[in-house]
């Protein structure tokens, strides 16, 4: 065994071995328990960042741990390779997205291999290949045939820069999440999948996700947004027209003083035809930001239509207003407004001088709406002559009474509604899977026939940044169906389509069908899924929805796609900038910043770059290109080795919290690995060891062996159950301190160290696999570490012969005594009283009280 640790040499040899022996390729094996470990696949942007490294290291640690448990472990990888960044890069370079994407895949694949991740590369997929999206297209046509797909014109969030539709979740502070362009509203026809048909099941099944973080589950419950209310009909005065309103607070119905409708409501458009001010306001609303954050903070504005609605119970006439806070694509596009009991309605009524009528009050006092609305569920009063029986009722009784009356009169009904909207899957971009629908000359819309699938996206195109090549190329859109001319759909799928079922395709990536059900049902559901919490309400919801679609198509037999979910935190790094002569901030890499001065709390006071510019330190922030504070993983691997980078990633922070990148921490991880190498090297150099005989161990040897097996127990629990990888590493480091100080004088000393090194090598194998692979062989094992088993805890070794008891006199520690592990309270008390240090502090005092905490503490109170 070479004396010095050489990571580049070791890692290259081990990676070559894994590749040549196809170590991580697996097939279905009914005789073994399976374990499917999956990290969210990357977008091939060009280079891995530290966020990728953290995600994939966590996944690899879990997968390797489960392999040593004897399980048949699948850990695949692939590429989420459609999307806007490739298009934008192609536009900038006047080329096609395809070569840019495939070059990035090749580069990043090599980076993943350098980090030693144990992937089954035989299952690699790229979502931009026809072999993949063919089956997505096929499945979409089947959903269409089942009535799960429809096309309609709708108001959408539109990014003028990227020329594409954005989901509400993709609009941040009124701007596009990708390019920060202000978002406008636009009416376009697009395709939808009826996720709302599964809203109830998606909501109820959240309760079965025992292995998912509570935060993710809460976010999904809120996003699905189930509510129970009443949908009622309001008639328009002097008209045959009527419109529906849904409310979850029917108890406030008798306090309605106006009705607000969306700018896109048919009544609004009708009224605008003779009202120029209203028409202008409607145009203003169409271009407004409709995200929740914007709606919550924007000024509430409206214009009266001149129309009046008839209250469904009292018959009272109330004005109809168009308001910017009502959306046509949410609910019915109309809301009953009760300013006395809704703060938004209150502010609007105050602004426009509208009537307020209180009809709910606290049970034990009068209601005051002089300064704000009373929004609690109190007791009804002031209900009027049309329904005086409501007075005195509380919320649920009032709900039931109003429901009964409206139902009996045919004016309303109880209803469950969801905040969740159907999934708009159309995108007006090129680099995506073509939507497999055609339109015949007579206007008939139909799925592309199965024998014409896949509808292949042409890759040999040039992006001009003005129009999608498949929209510009009329010849591409022209096709025939049964000899009749037809035109292809030129929209492409939302890329969330590809990422919603990739996990299932890994089970049979080369099958000439969407899924091989036998293989899919062997591997699914995923046992461990790993990815960022930012995906909670988009990918992770679509992921669950798609699995239920696959189930109902008979392709899988489980209800949920993943048993356990770990959401890793972000990676942060120091951020520095200076202001140039034009007043612009220039961000400087932390690798180029020299800290000149720190305050007494260790905070940076002064720093400069290599050019002498004095830098402003802004603290730790998420690694990003915009702040130039990303650390290239490849640079760190070349400097310290992959195992060191992996160890730091696992040790620096609990997995679900943010990780602060500190190169000093990386150096510390590197020193630890070198210490372990040196300990093993010295042990091997001393020659073979004899068998360990636990019956001959001294008390100190027993104590060391106890520490070893306590560590095995803790690391097993930390990795396998708690997933607290940082504390697992800390436990091994603490054990290493004991091993480094242990004498190596006798044969049993060396035999004990041999047992410890064998265990430590396997305990660390999931985290530092290259070194562990090498040490395993150097320690004399003939098999490969991947084929070994996780170390077992020797329960007998954990039994202590004696205990160290702390003795206090009047709250101060005065002695530490060693007692038999099974010593009685009386025996411990006597030993404590007999101790010379204790006697010294009891001189002249009488012991009044004795407190004994078994195995830990003896406390004497004396005066």
UniProtKB/Swiss-Prot annotation:
Motif mapping: 'HIGH' region: 42-52
Matches recorded under NCBIfam families: leuS_bact
EC numbers, comma separated: 6.1.1.4
Keywords of this entry: Aminoacyl-tRNA synthetase, ATP-binding, Cytoplasm, Ligase, Nucleotide-binding, Protein biosynthesis
Reaction(s) the record says it catalyses: tRNA(Leu) + L-leucine + ATP = L-leucyl-tRNA(Leu) + AMP + diphosphate
Record-listed ATP binding positions: 625
Family indicated by similarity: Belongs to the class-I aminoacyl-tRNA synthetase family.
Any one GO CC term of the record: cytosol
Pfam families cross-referenced by the UniProt entry: Anticodon_1, tRNA-synt_1, tRNA-synt_1_2, tRNA-synt_1g
Name by which UniProt lists this protein: Leucine--tRNA ligase
InterPro entries: aa-tRNA-synth_I_CS (IPR001412), aa-tRNA-synth_Ia (IPR002300), Leu-tRNA-ligase (IPR002302), Leu_tRNA-synth_edit (IPR025709), M/V/L/I-tRNA-synth_anticd-bd (IPR013155), Methionyl/Leucyl_tRNA_Synth (IPR015413), Rossmann-like_a/b/a_fold (IPR014729), tRNAsynth_Ia_anticodon-bd (IPR009080)
Gene3D superfamilies assigned to the protein according to its UniProt record, in alphabetical order: 2.20.28.290, 3.10.20.590, HUPs, Isoleucyl-tRNA Synthetase, Domain 1
Enzyme class: ligase
Gene name, Swiss-Prot/TrEMBL: leuS
Natural source organism: Shewanella denitrificans (strain OS217 / ATCC BAA-1090 / DSM 15013)
Residue span of motif 'KMSKS' region: 622-626
GO MF: aminoacyl-tRNA deacylase activity; ATP binding; leucine-tRNA ligase activity
A single BP term in Gene Ontology: leucyl-tRNA aminoacylation
PANTHER family reported in the protein's UniProt record: LEUCINE--TRNA LIGASE, MITOCHONDRIAL, LEUCYL-TRNA SYNTHETASE
Subcellular location: Cytoplasm
Organism domain of life: Bacteria
